[in-house]
């Protein structure tokens, strides 16, 4: 069974990493997986996965965190010729693969600026000698659109072109229809895969609290408050490990039992040994903490008008899976009390964190059901 994936990351690598876990699970499950990656160095994220080949499209990225524009690697806005080159490469790859399943990441729930490209891909897929199952892959939360015309157009695309939506979340924690009500109104089945989490690495260090921060102003504030708390409250049995983004230059040491690190791939091995994880409420940050056994304290990113992270933090807190600290309330006393509250949270043993494997099973089942016997 052949699977073709379209994925486009714009700001950070979260979307591509989640799709790499899904592609890897599908490949390990015996599918022949081809990926068309449109973000900078996107194809590299898929290298080395079993039965997965990745093709790099001419890359595009966002100009800022508000997704106000697109830029090429040279920092220029893409012109018609650039878009045509991307489209031609994408469609040539699709026709070479002749997939049984076409999996499109996020669209039509997002990536609106890529509508012409994705719709051309869909029409080309429909014109193949054997029409593939066309499915959407979407995370647990969709940023709502204020313009009802845009919402109606998204609903129209979903109804007209897609046979299924794979939702990488848990309906009991937060249904997709909470942030995209139209998804429940157009007759396209929603299949909840569970959360797409990484395999757990071995813990190399016993860490009481692990703090990770993003690159924006909110990340800098979180690092500074965490250092202020840790220098007075870290204990030998409960050290604090604070991982900072490259642009910050915190003190090399802030007291005994406090360890400050540049962000690195070793982060997850520390997280695997942590009792509590303090970080923003992005999809991967939240799910990795739960999968690795740490109790999450979620301090969501709220810059650039984003609602995704506060929505996720509130939902996980309501479900008893995380402690929620709004960014506006972030100070040393509140962070300390929230960390202490998180210690009493139950482990995530009953939460479905095998979303990549379940996505593969769902896709194979849907394809089998769609082929006339």
Regions inferred by a protein language model and the residue ranges of each:
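A donor-sugar binding/catalytic signature common to diverse glycosyltransferases
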Residues: 267-311
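Nucleotide-activated donor-dependent transferases that construct or modify glycoconjugates
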Residues: 1-12, 104-106
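Conserved nucleotide-sugar donor-interacting segment of glycosyltransferase catalytic cores
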Residues: 91-159
């Amino acid at each position: 069974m052949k699977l073709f994936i379209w994925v486009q990351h714009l700001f950070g690598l979260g979307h591509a990493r989640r799709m790499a876990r899904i592609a890897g699970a599908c490949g390990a499950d015996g599918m022949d997986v081809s990926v068309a990656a449109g973000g900078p160095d996107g194809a590299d994220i898929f290298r080395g996965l079993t039965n997965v080949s990745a093709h790099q499209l001419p890359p595009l990225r966002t100009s800022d965190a508000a997704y106000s524009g697109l830029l090429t690697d040279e920092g220029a806005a893409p012109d018609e010729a650039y878009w045509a080159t991307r489209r031609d490469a994408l469609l040539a790859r699709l026709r070479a693969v002749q997939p049984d399943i076409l999996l499109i990441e996020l669209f039509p729930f997002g990536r609106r600026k890529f509508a012409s490209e994705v719709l051309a891909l869909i029409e080309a897929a429909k014109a193949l000698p054997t029409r593939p199952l066309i499915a959407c892959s979407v995370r647990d939360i969709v940023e709502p659109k204020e313009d009802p015309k845009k919402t109606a157009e998204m609903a129209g695309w979903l109804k007209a072109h897609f046979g299924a939506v794979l939702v990488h979340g848990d309906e009991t924690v937060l249904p997709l229809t909470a942030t995209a009500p139209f998804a429940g109104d157009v007759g396209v089945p929603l299949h909840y895969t569970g959360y797409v989490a990484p395999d757990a690495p071995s813990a190399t260090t016993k860490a009481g609290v692990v703090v990770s921060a993003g690159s924006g102003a909110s990340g800098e504030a979180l690092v500074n408050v965490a250092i202020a708390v840790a220098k007075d409250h870290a204990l030998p049995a409960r050290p604090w490990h604070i991982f900072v983004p490259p642009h910050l230059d915190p003190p090399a040491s802030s007291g005994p039992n406090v360890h400050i690190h540049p962000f690195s791939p070793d982060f997850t091995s520390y997280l695997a040994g942590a009792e509590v994880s303090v970080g923003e409420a992005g999809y991967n940050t939240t799910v990795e903490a739960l999968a690795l056994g740490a109790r999450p304290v979620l301090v969501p990113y709220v810059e650039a008008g984003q609602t995704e992270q506060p929505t996720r933090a509130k939902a996980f807190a309501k479900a008893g899976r995380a402690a929620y600290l709004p960014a506006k309330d972030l100070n040393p006393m509140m962070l300390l009390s929230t960390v202490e509250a998180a210690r009493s949270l139950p482990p995530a043993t009953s939460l479905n964190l095998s979303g990549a494997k379940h996505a593969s099973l769902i896709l194979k089942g849907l394809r089998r059901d769609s082929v006339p016997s």
